[in-house]
Regions:
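Short, charge/polar-rich alpha-helical segments
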Residues: 2-26
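Short, charge-rich amphipathic interface segments used for partner binding and complex assembly
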Residues: 24-68
């Protein structure tokens, strides 16, 4: 029974950590969007979009790792 309780505690800690990581990615993506929308420079907008795409890809990879 103790092993199950330890497992449940570790699982909950991992879930909480994952939620925090996902929130961080969400905030970073939102900041890049704001930066992109505020800029009238095409190069800066393109860089922001690349950053957003990369952050989304990393976030999705983490989600797939956690689910799979």
């Amino acid at each position: 029974m103790k092993k199950t309780q330890r497992y449940e505690k570790r699982l909950e800690a991992a879930r909480e950590n994952c939620r925090e990581v996902m929130q961080t990615y969400k905030k970073e993506i939102e900041l890049e969007r704001k930066r992109m929308n505020a800029s009238h420079n095409g190069f800066v907008r393109q860089c922001c979009q690349q950053n957003i795409d990369q952050l989304k890809a990393e976030k999705e990879a983490i989600e797939m790792e956690v689910v799979g």
